[in-house]
Amino acid sequence: MWPVLIRERHDEDLPVCVDILRAVHEQASYPINWPTDPARWLTPEAALGIWVAVDAEQVVGHVILTAAGPAAEVERLFVDPKATGQGIGRQLLQHCVTTAAALDRDLSLEVVDNRGAAVHLYRRAGWLETGRTPIDWGGEHASELIRFTAP
């Protein structure tokens, strides 16, 4: 696929992002527990940047970079199920890597262990697994968080 446009998320993108998130949740159980207010969940206060991937003027992906003390974390990374397998997730991830480097912040992320495609993406992109933490909120879907740091 040709590179998609990665741009800041606009207010008018939020309903589409919620719709895509719902489709991801229904297909892949992400997030494991559906948020009470998905629009708010997609707009954390600690955000350093919120971006969408756009292809043919359609939002097809989403990612947030949040502050974590002096470091940064990748959060809320998802791609429209109709657009998976085209490298969009990797482009969004790379945008976060580039932005965190420009801000001189170390970068990490956490992913639940049921997200095989996401774990594969992070490993292929050179991210390093740095730990695992048991969780009690994953129900039958997941039992631990896997922590990765950017290369």
What are these regions (language model features)?
Residues T84, L109-V119, I135-A142:
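Conserved beta-strand-loop-alpha-helix junction that forms the acyl-donor binding cleft
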Residues G87:
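Glycine-rich phosphate-binding loop
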Residues A100-V111:
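Conserved GNAT acetyl-CoA-binding A-motif
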Residues E129-R132:
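A secondary-structure capping/hinge motif
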Residues E144-P151:
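Terminal substrate-recognition subdomain of acyl/acetyltransferases
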